Amino acid sequence: HERTHTGEKPFECSECHKRFTRDHHLKTHLRLHTGEKPYSCPHCPRHFVQVANLRRHLRVHTGERPYACARCPARF
């Protein structure tokens, strides 16, 4: 947590030299360079680098619309 305050980013990408505060952020970032997409949609052929992107994509198949407009009944 201290790195948030100090700005220290000890983990550097060997490809593009972008720096990260946490080693797992670097690991996820490296997938952009390798093309690895370990998270697969069980409903279609799409694959994702980050699990959060898979979770967001799954709403396409479930029809879930978790966000509501404050001014009308529309959901997104």
Curated annotation (Swiss-Prot):
Coiled coil: none annotated. The keyword Repeat applies. It is found in: Nucleus. The keyword Transmembrane helix does not apply. Keywords: Developmental protein, DNA-binding, Gap protein, Metal-binding, Nucleus, Repeat, Zinc, Zinc-finger. GO terms for cellular component: nucleus. Its main location: nucleus. One of its GO terms (biological process) is regulation of gene expression. A zinc finger (C2H2-type) spans 11-33, 39-61. GO terms for molecular function: DNA binding; zinc ion binding. Disulfide bonds: none annotated. SUPFAM superfamilies: beta-beta-alpha zinc fingers. InterPro entries: Zinc_finger, Znf_C2H2_sf, Znf_C2H2_type. It comes from the Eukaryota. Pfam families: zf-C2H2. Krueppel is a gap class segmentation protein. Belongs to the krueppel C2H2-type zinc-finger protein family. This is Protein krueppel.
